[in-house]
Every structure is written in structure tokens, then in C-alpha cells.
């Protein structure tokens, strides 16, 4: 609400307060003398209200200088041939070859019941150039790999054998366009000969993979069919400005490089320029091409019949075949950019073929092919044509005109021609008029057909199109002109009606109840004050109290304002407006009848007394509204156009996820038989033994249960001991102590081993440390006169020592007595004679045994 309107409302409320202050509050009328209208309970735009006329409302005036503009078409039309090109979303595809050597180390466990693969490690290595030459020509490689890591050189040989030359053979695969050649298709997984041992087996496989790679513009990277990514442009040759984000020393180009197909081994193919990239785990190579090998545009459709409509700011290329319109944001054609020169040959060839097919009906004159770019990102190749019938009319007009210039080759104006030029406008009008011609134009030379009798479909389409647009535009122009004139007349009528009843006119304009008053040549509009709708009642009598001849011309109304308990009286106006005065009176007339509308009801007063209430629908409505009946444009079923097919959208992604996952699953299935879990393999074998032992114990009954409990107890004891030892070893102090003890035991064992070795090698020196010195003195004659004894005496002494040692052992055994086990065995022998030793009564046998016993001693 504006400041002026707020001031108007304040003045209005002040005036109402003065008026109400001057009035004396009335006592509520008895219910028998009043009637409550249903409009108090209805939602309406015109509730009961008090509208006070104020000279401080918003001021308005009616315009008297309305001008109706003229409406006319400003479009030019031209026929021609149209070719539409779209962005090429299909990536640039090219063949690549991958070289790699796969080293697979498998750890095999030789179990009791089954062998299992406990570990599998695979490494991939790139192939040097000297070996790629051999692989590309004769499909052979070396079955060994030499690598250096952290200063340590390692050599892996297939089957843990020797380095030899092996052949590559084709292998299977699932991905389309992928072909592999491998030297070793079977993994070396033979276990060792010793049971419960582990052996490591090595497999070296030379692998060549022929596949496709894809790269999208701007060619910052490309992806192979198997999912390998390379961060460089496939057109990079080491010298140009193409993208390259790989290691500088990993790329090189070889000229006149020869690569032989597997089926054509032994031939000498033509050399080519080939790029090589070392990725560390594999080597890639591909044939180098220039960027011109890829065209960024792709031909979509060619339309033989197209109408170019120039609207002033843009050109609409409308086709009848595709029911579509291509809109350009410029009216001037462009030259074909250098980046799109790849389509120039195709455009010239197609346009020439299309024009040859319709040259009997059309002529192109001196017009050339023009290119446009649409707002949707399409490139249009446009060749304007002129119907020969229209060209004939133009020639006849020029021949019959005395001041005409010498005839020239007929050609329609290009869409980029000046729209205001008179010859262009005349030519377009003649072309439209030619579509309405019903008689053929005479030929310009004998024996030549003008082609007007053929009635070509393109002329009919253009004529129908031009006629339809002309009729629609004329109809819309007439409607707009009539609408403007009607608004102008209505403005004049409303201006005159405000001189009679400004409140009604302004309320109809605002769409709600307002108070209006003319102040000279302007109108003051103010708001109305709503009353409490529930307190509004109508007096049944319209006679003036205390007078027999005077009556009210409008019924009396009792009401209260919102937030006010006082009851006031006024008179009911039109559209539920309440007047605060009772001055609308008249001389009472005999047999009078009045109808007053309040909401959706009409109150009927007969002889100035409320007679009845009827519905609003009971009174017929005077229809002053005239509806506009127009014929609508017929429906046009648009053809469904597919700019990019599903196959093109599918091929637009450089990552062929389906092929990558299929290839991965195929490779995973090849090693599924080898990938056995150690725990499962070993536990399965152990479970068989444990299950068999359990069945054996169950068959023994209580004895088996006792044995099982005993074994479980012993096993639990050992388990507790081992667990305690492990816990003690995990403790820092315990671990250090155990390590120190182990080191001490190792040192002690080494010392004892050395001493035992010396004892066995030099026993005399160990028993008599000074024997060497004594021998030296005896040899030099410096020592005392001691001479060694003879060998016979030495043997006698040794024999005496041996017998003495044996006698001491027997004496110790007799002194120790028999053991408990010996006594128990002897008691059993005495109780059971069968267990006694058999006594030999044979003298010869006894003598032989005694001889053996004496020999032992």
C-alpha cells in the first residue's frame, strides 16, 4: 500500500468516525421485523460494506490517445536442398597390439589326501624392442624374464628350466575384436615329491593381444578394449603438439616397421610408421595416423525438399519429410571451417547427385553451397534452388519490360540477401504467384519442357506452406487489430460511464468493491470498510415511521462494525453496499413491487413490505457476451526423429564396460581350478582322518571314550602349555629372555660340538695336554731319559683297562639289585611255568651258547 493510499484510508476512517459519532446508536430491531440475508454466510467479492466518498483517494484518468499498430508478415521463403550434420560422438577407433610377459609363481602344498595351491603371485613385464620384432614377424619369444628391483637381479624361467625360444599360438577369448597369442597356456602347478612340503613353481607366458582402442575428442587419452588407459593422444608422434602425459623415455616411433599376420607368417608385408609405448607392465604399439583421419562431424540426413524462411533475426529451415525445423541464430551463411573440411567432398558429391535428380524442375543458377550452424549445434549445408516455372515467369517479365536490363541467368536470392531490396521482393511474390498458376507457361525455346504440368510436390508443399502461414498471419493480424479497436472503444465507454456512476465502473475494473468519485477530469478511488457480516439484517418494512405518504426507495439495514458492539442503521445499495444515510425516500405508491439482490438471493418487497425471498437463478440473465467461434488449425503428427541412435550412443563411450567385464570373467574362469584355499584343502584332508579315528573310537565303546578323553586331556594340556609359551613369548621381557636363552643354548651346543670333534680326532691330546711337548723333547733328546714302551705292552695295558671297566659295571649292577619290573616279571614266571625260559639240555647247544657268552665278555 502506497503512502498516498494510507493517507486516504486514514481520512476515510476519520470521516466515518465523525459520521458515526453524529449518529445515535439504534436499538436492535425485534426479530419479527427483520430478515437476515444469506449473503452474510457466503464467500463473495462484494460483502456488506460501507463506502465513504473521499476526495483523497488514488487518482486515475482514462487514456484518449490509443494507437493500434498494423500487423503484417515480414518473412521471406526460399526452396533448396539441405544436408544436416551432427557431432560425431562415436570415438576414433584404431587397432593396437599389446606385448607382455606374465610371470606366475604358485606355491603348492603336497598334502596327505590332496594337493592345494596356498599362494599365487602374478607379475607382468613389458617387452623390449628386440623381442617385439621377433614376436611381430615369426611369433616367437624367449621363455625367461630378467628384472632388477632394488638393486637385486632376478631371472624367471618357464617351468623352472632353461631359457629357450618358444612359439606363440592363438588362444581363445570372449571380447569382440580381441585376439591373443600365448606361448604358455597351462600353469606349472606340479607339487614336490616329498609329502607335507611346499614347492614354488614358475610359469612364464609371452602374450600378444590384438584389440581395438578408442579415443574421444579432444584426444587427451585412449582406452583399449580390455580396459587399459593411456594418457596421451593416439596422433602424438613426438614432434607435434598433441597431448602427451606419459613418461618421456617410454615412447618412441619406428618407421618402416613390418608386422606380419599370424596366418601370413613368412611373408614380407609393407612397412608402416608405428608408435611404441612402454607402460612398465606391458608394451603397446599402434599405427600412427594424422588427426585428419578422424572427422568431427557425421552426416545425419539429407532433405530433398526444404523451405528456408527468413524471419529477420533467424532462418528456419523447414522440411516436409521430417516435420522439423532447424533454426539458425544468424541470417548470413558462413564458409566451411577448416576443422570441418572432411565433409566438403561428401557435401559436393551429394548435392551434385541430388541436383541432377531434380534439375528438370529446378535450377540453381550461380548459387553456391552455404553453411549454417543451428542453435542446437547442427551444421547445415544449404543449396538454394529456383523452380524452372518461376524462372520462366521472371524471364518473361524481363522480356516484356521495355527498360529491363539484358537477361541474366535466373537465380533466387540467397537467405542472406537484403530483405528490403525490391527485386528480391518481386521475385518472391512471383514465385508465390507461380504456385497458383493453373495454365502452363509457354516454353522459351522450341522442344523444351517448362515442367509446370508435372506439378511437383515441392511446389505444392511450398504453396500450401505459404498459404497457410499467410492465412494464419492475416487472421492473427485481424484479431489483434479488432482487439485493439475494441479496447479503444471500451476505454471511451468507461470514461463516459464514470460520469454517471464512477463507483460501479471502477469496482468492475478492480474486480472488487471500491468507492469512486469524479474530481473534474480525474477519478478518486478509495477503499470500503467491511462490516460484521453476522450482524447484518434487513428491515421487512420500507415505510418511513411517522409518515403515511413517504416510503424508503431502498430497504433499511441494521449492522455493526467489526470489534464494535453498537448497532447502526443505513440503507442497502447495489452489490451489498450500505449507505449510512436514510435519505433515499419516495412517495408511497399503491401496488408497488421491488426486487433487491443480496448475494445469491433476491428479496421481494410487495407494497413496501418484505414478501418473500427467491433464488438468484429464478431471474433470467440478460446475455450480453458474444463468444468468438473460430476454426482451429488441423493437427500435425510429427515424425519421431532420432538424432543419435542407440548404437551410436552405446559406441560413444570409450569404456566398453560390457566387454571389459566379460573379458575379466573369462580370465578369472581360467584360473578358477587352481585357486584353492589352503585352509579348506588341508582341513578337508584332516577331517577325513579325524572322522575315521572318531568312528574307530565310537566302535570301542566306553574304552574308546576313555581313550578319547585321555587324548583330549593331554591335547588340552599341551595346548595350554603352548598357549602359555606363546603368551610369554609375546611379552617383551619374556621374549627377550627366551631369545637370550636360545642364544646361550646355541653357543653351548657349538662349544660342545667343537670339543667332541677334538676328542674324537685327538683323544690323547685331550687326556694328556702335555703329550705334544713331551714328544718334542724326546725327539730332540733334551728331556729326561724316558723311552716309550712297546706296542705289545701298550695293548696289554689297554686290555687290562677295558676288563677293569667291565668288571666295575657288573659290580654296580649287582649292588643295585633287580628293579620292580624285573621282580614282577620274575613272579609271573614262577606262577606260570609256561613263561619260564626254556632250559637247554642239549649239551651241544649249551656249549655253543656258553661259547658265545664268553666271547662277548
Curated annotation (Swiss-Prot):
UniProt xrefs under InterPro entries: Glycoprot_B_PH1, Glycoprot_B_PH2, Glycoprot_B_PH2_sf, Glycoprotein_B_ecto_C, Herpes_Glycoprot_B
Transmembrane segments: 733-753
Segments for region (Oligomerization): 561-620
Cell compartments where the protein resides: Virion membrane; Host cell membrane; Host endosome membrane; Host Golgi apparatus membrane
PTM statement from Swiss-Prot or TrEMBL: A proteolytic cleavage by host furin generates two subunits that remain linked by disulfide bonds.
Glycosylation sites: 76, 163, 290, 329, 348, 395, 436, 563, 629
Protein's UniProt name: Envelope glycoprotein B
Lineage: Viruses, Duplodnaviria, Heunggongvirae, Peploviricota, Herviviricetes
Chain's gene name: gB
Amino acid at each position: 500500500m502506497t503512502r498516498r493510499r494510507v493517507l486516504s484510508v486514514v481520512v476515510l476512517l476519520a470521516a466515518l468516525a465523525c459520521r458515526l459519532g453524529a449518529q445515535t446508536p439504534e436499538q436492535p430491531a425485534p426479530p419479527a421485523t427483520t430478515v437476515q440475508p444469506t449473503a452474510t454466510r457466503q464467500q463473495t467479492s462484494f460483502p456488506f460494506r460501507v463506502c465513504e466518498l473521499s476526495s483523497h483517494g488514488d487518482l486515475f484518468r482514462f487514456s484518449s490517445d490509443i494507437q493500434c499498430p498494423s500487423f503484417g508478415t515480414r518473412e521471406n521463403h526460399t526452396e533448396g536442398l539441405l544436408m544436416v550434420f551432427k557431432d560425431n560422438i562415436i570415438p576414433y577407433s584404431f587397432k593396437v597390439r599389446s606385448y607382455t610377459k606374465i610371470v606366475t609363481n604358485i606355491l603348492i602344498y603336497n598334502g596327505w589326501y590332496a594337493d592345494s595351491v596356498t599362494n599365487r603371485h602374478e607379475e607382468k613385464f613389458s617387452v623390449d624392442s628386440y623381442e617385439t620384432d621377433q614376436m611381430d614377424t615369426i611369433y616367437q619369444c624367449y621363455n625367461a624374464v630378467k628384472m632388477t628391483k632394488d638393486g637385486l637381479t632376478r631371472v624367471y624361467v618357464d617351468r623352472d628350466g632353461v631359457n629357450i625360444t618358444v612359439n606363440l599360438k592363438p588362444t581363445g577369448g570372449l571380447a569382440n575384436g580381441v585376439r591373443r597369442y600365448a606361448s604358455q597356456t597351462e600353469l606349472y602347478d606340479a607339487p614336490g615329491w616329498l609329502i607335507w612340503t611346499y614347492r614354488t613353481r614358475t610359469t612364464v607366458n609371452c602374450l600378444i593381444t590384438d584389440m581395438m582402442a578408442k579415443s574421444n575428442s579432444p584426444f587427451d587419452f585412449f582406452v583399449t578394449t580390455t580396459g587399459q588407459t593411456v594418457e596421451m593422444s593416439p596422433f602424438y608422434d613426438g614432434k607435434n603438439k598433441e597431448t602427451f602425459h606419459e613418461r618421456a623415455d617410454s615412447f618412441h616411433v619406428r618407421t618402416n616397421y613390418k608386422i606380419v599376420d599370424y596366418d601370413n607368417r613368412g611373408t614380407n608385408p609393407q612397412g608402416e610408421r608405428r608408435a611404441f609405448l612402454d607402460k612398465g607392465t606391458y608394451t603397446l604399439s599402434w599405427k600412427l595416423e594424422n588427426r585428419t583421419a578422424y572427422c568431427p562431424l557425421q552426416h545425419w540426413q539429407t532433405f530433398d525438399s526444404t523451405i528456408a524462411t527468413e524471419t529477420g533475426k533467424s532462418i528456419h529451415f523447414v522440411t516436409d519429410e521430417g516435420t522439423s525445423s532447424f533454426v539458425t541464430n544468424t541470417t548470413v551463411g558462413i564458409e566451411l571451417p577448416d576443422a570441418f573440411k572432411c565433409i566438403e567432398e561428401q557435401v559436393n558429391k551429394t548435392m551434385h547427385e541430388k541436383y541432377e535428380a531434380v534439375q528438370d524442375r529446378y535450377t540453381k543458377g550461380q548459387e553456391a553451397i552455404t553453411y549454417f550452424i543451428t542453435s542446437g549445434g547442427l551444421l547445415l549445408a544449404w543449396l538454394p534452388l529456383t523452380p524452372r516455372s518461376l524462372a520462366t515467369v521472371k524471364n518473361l517479365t524481363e522480356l516484356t519490360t521495355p527498360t529491363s536490363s539484358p537477361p541474366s541467368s535466373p537465380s533466387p536470392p540467397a537467405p542472406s540477401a537484403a530483405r528490403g531490396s525490391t527485386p528480391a521482393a518481386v521475385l518472391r511474390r512471383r514465385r508465390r504467384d507461380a504456385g497458383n498458376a493453373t495454365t502452363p507457361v509457354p516454353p522459351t525455346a522450341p522442344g523444351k519442357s517448362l515442367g509446370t504440368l508435372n506439378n511437383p510436390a515441392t511446389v505444392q508443399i511450398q504453396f500450401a506452406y505459404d498459404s497457410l502461414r499467410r492465412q494464419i498471419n492475416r487472421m492473427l493480424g485481424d484479431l489483434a487489430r479488432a482487439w485493439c479497436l475494441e479496447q479503444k472503444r471500451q476505454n471511451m465507454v468507461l470514461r463516459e460511464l464514470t460520469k454517471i456512476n464512477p463507483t460501479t465502473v471502477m469496482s468492475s475494473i478492480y474486480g472488487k468493491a471500491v468507492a469512486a468519485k469524479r474530481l473534474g477530469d480525474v477519478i478518486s478511488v478509495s477503499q470500503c470498510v467491511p462490516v460484521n457480516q453476522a450482524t447484518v439484517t434487513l428491515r421487512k418494512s420500507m415505510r418511513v415511521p411517522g409518515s403515511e405518504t413517504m416510503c424508503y426507495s431502498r430497504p433499511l439495514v441494521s449492522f455493526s462494525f467489526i470489534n464494535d458492539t453498537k448497532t447502526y442503521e443505513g440503507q442497502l445499495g447495489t452489490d451489498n453496499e450500505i449507505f449510512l444515510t436514510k435519505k433515499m425516500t419516495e412517495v408511497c405508491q399503491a401496488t408497488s413491487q421491488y426486487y433487491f439482490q443480496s448475494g445469491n438471493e433476491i428479496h421481494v418487497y410487495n407494497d413496501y413490505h418484505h414478501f418473500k425471498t427467491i433464488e438468484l437463478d429464478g431471474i433470467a440473465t440478460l446475455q450480453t457476451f458474444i463468444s468468438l467461434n473460430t476454426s482451429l488449425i488441423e493437427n500435425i503428427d510429427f515424425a519421431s526423429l532420432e538424432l543419435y541412435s542407440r548404437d551410436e550412443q552405446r559406441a560413444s563411450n570409450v569404456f566398453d564396460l560390457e566387454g571389459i567385464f566379460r573379458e575379466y570373467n573369462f580370465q578369472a574362469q581360467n584360473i578358477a581350478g587352481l585357486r584353492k584355499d589352503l585352509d579348506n584343502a588341508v582341513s578337508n584332508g584332516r577331517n577325513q582322518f579325524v572322522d575315521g579315528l572318531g568312528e574307530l573310537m565310537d566302535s570301542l565303546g566306553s574304552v574308546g571314550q576313555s581313550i578319547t578323553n585321555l587324548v583330549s586331556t593331554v591335547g588340552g594340556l599341551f595346548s595350554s602349555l603352548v598357549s602359555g609359551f606363546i603368551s610369554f613369548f609375546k611379552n617383551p621381557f619374556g621374549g627377550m629372555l627366551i631369545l637370550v636363552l636360545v642364544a646361550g643354548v646355541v653357543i653351548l651346543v657349538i662349544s660342545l660340538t667343537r670339543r667332541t670333534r677334538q676328542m674324537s680326532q685327538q683323544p690323547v691330546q685331550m687326556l694328556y695336554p702335555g703329550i705334544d711337548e713331551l714328544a718334542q723333547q724326546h725327539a730332540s733328546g733334551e728331556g729326561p731319559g724316558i723311552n716309550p714302551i712297546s706296542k705289545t705292552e701298550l695293548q696289554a695295558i689297554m686290555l687290562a683297562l677295558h676288563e677293569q671297566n667291565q668288571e666295575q659295571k657288573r659290580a654296580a649292577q649287582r649292588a643295585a639289585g633287580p628293579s620292580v619290573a624285573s621282580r614282577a616279571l620274575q613272579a609271573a614266571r614262577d606262577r606260570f611255568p609256561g613263561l619260564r625260559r626254556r632250559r637247554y639240555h642239549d649239551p651241544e647247544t649249551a656249549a655253543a651258547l656258553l661259547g658265545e657268552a664268553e666271547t662277548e665278555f
